[in-house]
Every structure is written in C-alpha cells, then in structure tokens.
Amino acid sequence: MDAYEKIYQLYHLIKTKTAADLPGPYKVGVDLGTADVVLVVTDESGNPVAGSMRWASVVKDGLVVDFRGAMVIVEKLKAEVEAIMGITLDKGATAIPPGTVGRNALACGHVIAGAGLEPVCQVDEPVAAAKALDISHGIVVDIGGGTTGIAVLKNGELVFTADEPTGGTHVSLVLAGAYKIPFEEAEILKRDPARHRKIMPVILPVIEKMATVVKNMLAGYDEFNEYPVYVVGGTAYLQGFETEFGKAFGRKVHVPPHPLLVTPLGIAMFG
Ligand code: ATP
C-alpha cells in the first residue's frame, strides 16, 4: 500500500468503525490535538488496522490544558478500538509540536499512561506526518487547530523544525467575528465544504498569514527552495486552500487526502 492508499484506508476504517484483517504485532499512536484526539493502530509495516477520533478541546496551542478530560477521551478511544479489534492495546506513541519543552512535553505521555497505554515514543508532529507520507526529502507543513509546525527532511534526516501558534482556531475566530456568531458555530460553518467557497474571501487573510509564517520560518534556508512542500492538518481540508496557500507562499504545495489523518497515522508508525 502506498502512502495515500494508507490514508484512504485509515479514513474508511474510522468511518465504518471496522478493523483491517492484518496480523500483529500492532503499533498504536495517539494524536492529542487542539481540535480533536485521534487514536490509530497500524501493523508492523504501517498499514492501518483500526482507528477512532473525537472532537475535543483538551489541548491549547499544542499544550495539554485539560489533563483529566484528555485522559478520559483517550480511554474511550482505546476501549472503542479494542472492541473493534477484539484485543487489548497496552502501549503507544504520542507527538508534540516542535519546540515543546519541559513538563509540557511530558504531559502527552502522562495522558496516555493514565489511559492505560505505556508511552513508548514521543515525536514531533510534522516528523510523524513525513513518516506517514513516506517522504525522505521535502518540507512538511502541519497546520492543526492551534499550531503550524514544519519539518524539513534531507536524505531521510530531519534537518530543521519550527513551530508557531497559528492554526485553524484562528480561521474560526475570524469567521466568528465576521459573521457575529459564537466560536463553536464558526467551527461547524468552517467544516462544511458546501460553505467553503463563500467563506474563502473572509478567511483568505488568515491563510495568507499562515503562508507568511512558514515563509519566514524558512527564510535564509535557500537550499530548501527546490524541496517539495506538503501541507497536512485539518485546516488543509478547506477547498481552495492548496491554491491560495501556494500563491501566498510563492511555491506549489501538495495537500494529501484526508490531511487531518496524516499526522495521527505517522504517530502510530512510531508506536
Ligand atoms: P494541533 O496539532 O495544532 O494541536 P490538531 O491536532 O487538533 O491541532 P488537526 O486535527 O490537524 O489539528 O486539525 C484541526 C483543525 O482543522 C481545526 O481547526 C478544525 O476546525 C480544522 N478542520 C477540521 N476539519 C475541517 C474541515 N473539513 N474544513 C476545514 N477545517 C477543518
């Protein structure tokens, strides 16, 4: 299965609440995000076996702010996937935005440990995304709910990472302000593809700001100018995002299918 087939397969398994008939041992990854929590199981080769996700507000700007809430959600996702697969999951990997340090960096591990998964590894989110996309040479931009992180890979080695607190939450805040609606309503409006064409003019400045943030992160690194650029994270679902982000960034960018699932799939591959 190539990288995109794996992503489509994971989406299908989550949507149908089913498991792929693949033999173990299995790897588990948990993505504790600003907007959602995703648990993914893969086989040894990184083929998706099962997964589950929930919208949640337990993380802010990449940091766990509701420890107990996060733990309860991971417990539920774990129980759901265990029921689907008919086995017990006992360990897993987590990820953090690049540059997260100290106790904040430890929090994700504590959350999954509290939910019954021994933490085996903690990776940078865009590094996990690069793994899922099977990229050994290129720039991965991960635009989540609260943060925009990048990872640059050269010959399979991670040579640069950076992170900024700008993400889909800011898109929703702008929509909430423009339409004078609560944030939660703006989130729902934003996730409706039928409304994307209409909201694009309102949110375009935020997308342009994100592209500028990434451009600034890479300023002075001319050697990366020819590297392919992949954008993942839920914000990249916005119709027209690929074109508008690319225009503002000044380079062609690629958005894989189901961009929200790329990082969680990659985290599991480290499990
Ligand atoms: P972070 O990595 O910053 O902690 P996260 O892991 O929660 O956040 P993702 O799950 O990649 O980030 O993306 C969540 C963001 O994507 C949210 O802002 C959410 O509103 C947005 N999003 C999700 N689905 C869609 C959609 N269909 N259209 C537009 N935006 C979407």
Where are these regions (language model features)?
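A cytosolic small-molecule/anion-sensing beta-strand core signal
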Residues: 154
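Short glycine-rich anion-binding loops that position phosphate/pyrophosphate groups of nucleotides
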Residues: 146
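A structural feature that tracks compact, well-ordered secondary-structure segments
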Residues: 149-151
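Nucleotide/phosphate-binding catalytic cleft detector across ATP-hydrolyzing
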Residues: 1-34, 38-143, 157-271
